[in-house]
């Protein structure tokens, strides 16, 4: 990734252009059983880690000195959430501003194969009532059309939290987007189906360290 091809922006995160082709698979360490199912390494693990640390800095700057309930969206968000929370804790230990955190979990189901379903399923939504009056940081893996997050925020608003911020590792540029933007974005990416770093395709590829683009062979192989 060169300086000319990647545009840093606080609002949009790191913007990866449509013509970015990623890295060849053979220059990274990948599980052999996945190599034929992937098109490229799109975002290397080290870049993800560095970007996550910067997001943690931004969160400390904006909402330090608060007690935060971190709402991790499972399953895809768990790795980003784990790393983000760890970075925030490390920053908090060495800062005059202290963030105390508790982590809770919710599951959203909106995909079958690589197609977004019309109806959002919120699993664990009955527990949202305990977020009333709390400062909430929602941690998500990817914003696709924005409809999923908009629906979750609408549901959460019924319980009147004190504050809600959203951090998403990825935001996808899509013609079907409702233009929702999270408060903190890791990377803005083209309209490609990506896997790895806990993002899955029918529960496969979560164990990849890098974010990769799945190819058509992989989609057909693991289709349900």
UniProtKB/Swiss-Prot annotation:
GO molecular function: hypoxanthine phosphoribosyltransferase activity; metal ion binding; nucleotide binding
Record keyword Magnesium present: yes
Binding site for GMP: 140-148, 172, 193-194, 200
Record bears the keyword Iron: no
InterPro entries membership: HGPRT, Hxn_phspho_trans, PRibTrfase_dom, PRTase-like
Keywords of the record: Magnesium, Metal-binding, Nucleotide-binding
Binding site for Mg(2+): 140-141, 200
Pfam families: Pribosyltran (PF00156)
One of the GO BP terms on file: purine ribonucleoside salvage
Family: Belongs to the purine/pyrimidine phosphoribosyltransferase family.
Identification of the protein by name: Phosphoribosyltransferase domain-containing protein 1
The organism of origin for this protein: Xenopus tropicalis (Western clawed frog)
């Amino acid at each position: 990734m060169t300086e000319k091809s990647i545009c840093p922006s606080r609002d949009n995160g790191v913007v990866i252009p449509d013509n970015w082709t990623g890295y060849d698979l053979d220059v990274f360490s990948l599980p052999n059983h996945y190599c034929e199912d992937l098109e490229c390494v799109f975002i290397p693990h080290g870049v993800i880690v560095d970007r996550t640390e910067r997001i943690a800095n931004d969160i400390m700057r904006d909402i330090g000195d608060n007690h935060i309930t971190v709402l991790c969206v499972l399953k895809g968000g768990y790795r980003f959430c784990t790393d983000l929370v760890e970075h925030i804790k490390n920053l908090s230990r060495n800062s005059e501003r202290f963030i105390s955190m508790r982590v809770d979990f919710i599951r959203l189901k909106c995909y079958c194969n690589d197609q977004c379903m019309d109806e959002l399923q919120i699993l664990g939504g009955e527990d949202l009532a305990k977020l009333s009056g709390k400062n909430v940081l929602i941690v998500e893996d990817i914003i696709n059309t924005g409809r999923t997050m908009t629906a979750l925020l609408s549901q959460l608003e019924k319980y009147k939290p004190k504050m809600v911020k959203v951090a998403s590792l990825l935001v996808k540029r899509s013609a079907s987007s409702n233009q929702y933007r999270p408060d903190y974005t890791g990377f803005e990416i083209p309209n490609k189906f990506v896997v790895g770093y806990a993002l899955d395709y029918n529960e496969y590829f979560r164990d990849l360290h890098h974010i990769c683009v799945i190819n058509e062979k992989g989609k057909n192989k693991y289709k349900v």
